[in-house]
Amino acid sequence: MKSEKPDSLTPVQWLICVIAVIGFAFDTYELLMLPLIIRPALEGLGGLKFGSPGYNQWRDLFFYIPAISGGIFGLLGGYLTDKLGRRRVLTWSILVYAISACAAGFATSLPVLLFLRCTTFIGVCVEFVAAVAWLAELFPHPKQREAVLGYTQA
């Protein structure tokens, strides 16, 4: 039996795409905010002067450690997504991401802020993996799946 190529998305599929775009926009926002907040954070929480060795060291840590932790847990997220299910992992990763990002606003020291940035990146990276896998499952036709994944992440 041949499966027919769908001509367009259903209203529910459009809603899923819109929600995915909004979610990916928040992910991008969160990941790209660091260059804007790093200087005030290091000066305010650490009392560090711009360009000093301590400032440069903390700046580097804030850029590299969260990225490494997010990358490692993103790989682990793929495994967890397969084992525990896309929806469950997606839900928990969004909670980790949201709680960590909110708590980071109340950080009182640089180590606490760094830890919360790491957990935020972990949540974002795991959420991204789970969301892409779930979108791929929801759109079984190859051309439609390619278009949906491309447009929602653009």
Give the label of every model feature segment.
Residues M1-A154:
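Transmembrane-helix signature of 12-pass secondary carriers
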